[in-house]
Amino acid sequence: MRRVMWPLACAMALCGPAAAVPARAPDLSTTDAVLRWINGYRAKPDVARVPAAVRTLSQLGALRDSETSAVYVGFVAGIIGSYPQLAGELIEKILPIKAEDHWLIVRAVAYSGLPNWRDVLNRFASRMPSRQLMIEKYTTGKLPTLDAIAFEASPTPLDKLKGYTASVGDFFTGHKTPEPVRLEATSEVLDTLWGYYFATGSYGPVERILHMLPWSKDRQDTDKLTVGSMAKFTLASNAARVRRKSTVPGRLATSWRSSARRPSCGLLGLSSDE
């Protein structure tokens, strides 16, 4: 939890309202320029420029650290998931990035939500030889996808029944049922969810971020406190945009707005009014 959500913070701080994105071809020559473009993508989707943006990030060395690159992973995952018919073409055009950055393609496909994401990864496995093991781990379930985020909650009666049934089965078979692989809700995952939201404008990522809000009051777990506070801050910074997004259900929009507090927006000079 030592890192700062720098890419995500920059994406918010460097941009004005999404509606202000200019009509001319965007500048994608620097990391800051790409962040601005990602932040305004929902106002004017331009999927054809996504590969160029990723190639720029790779050339500038912005993809070396998986933690600080999480917002890019989420963005590419959201794009691939939104355009299943173009997935192969998009990946083809992103592949020329540095071989050491191919991890981003693998994770983005695994996080995309495509029904056939495993087939897509296997199709391109030979083109990413240094990521064969990573691909194998994702496709066999040894690494979690974005759908496997772990949110602790009190077990329901059905959960308890399933647990009891599994325990009885383990007793008679002598084999312990393996626990499903879960994705811990960290600040890296938070960045990834925001990247997915920037690409799609869908409320699914926001709903998951809202699940992290209670952690902002957890004084017993420093990691959760950090993630919860980051979730609260980023939600507050984006609260004004909810009024312009019809894809966010009323109950989520209300929760999102209620998370906005003026003191939180003072960090990094951000304003919830935009």
Model-derived features: where do they sit?
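Bacterial N-terminal signal peptides that target proteins for export
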Residues: M1-P7
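Bacterial N-terminal signal peptides
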Residues: P7-C15
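Non-catalytic all-alpha helical scaffold/repeat segments
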Residues: V21-E274
